[in-house]
Curated annotation (Swiss-Prot):
Pfam families: FeoC. One of its GO terms (molecular function) is DNA binding. It comes from Photorhabdus laumondii subsp. laumondii (strain DSM 15139 / CIP 105565 / TT01). Disulfide bonds: none annotated. Belongs to the FeoC family. HAMAP family: FeoC (MF_01586). This is Probable [Fe-S]-dependent transcriptional repressor.
Length: 79
């Protein structure tokens, strides 16, 4: 079983990460990782990046842009 600290550390190591990436890296269920990310956000340890903060910069040209609803997290206060 993973801990909140492991999830927070994984986000810190990645800089920015989504639940799917963390689920794979930590070998944990997606629903567990999503719940932990939400808890860390409520605690003020992580923050959600807005939907326009695309990691690749190509979202505006992507045909799936309307269906892509990936939430990305980073350490709170990190710029």
């Amino acid at each position: 079983m993973i801990s909140l600290l492991q999830v927070r550390d994984a986000v810190a190591l990645n800089g920015r990460a989504d639940a799917k990436l963390l689920s794979h890296q930590l070998s944990a269920s997606l629903s567990m990782v999503e719940a932990m990310l939400e808890q860390l956000t409520v605690m003020g340890k992580l923050e959600k990046l807005n939907a326009t903060a695309c990691l690749s910069g190509s979202c505006k040209q992507c045909p799936e842009v309307q269906q892509c609803d990936t939430v990305v997290y980073r350490i709170a206060g990190g710029y």
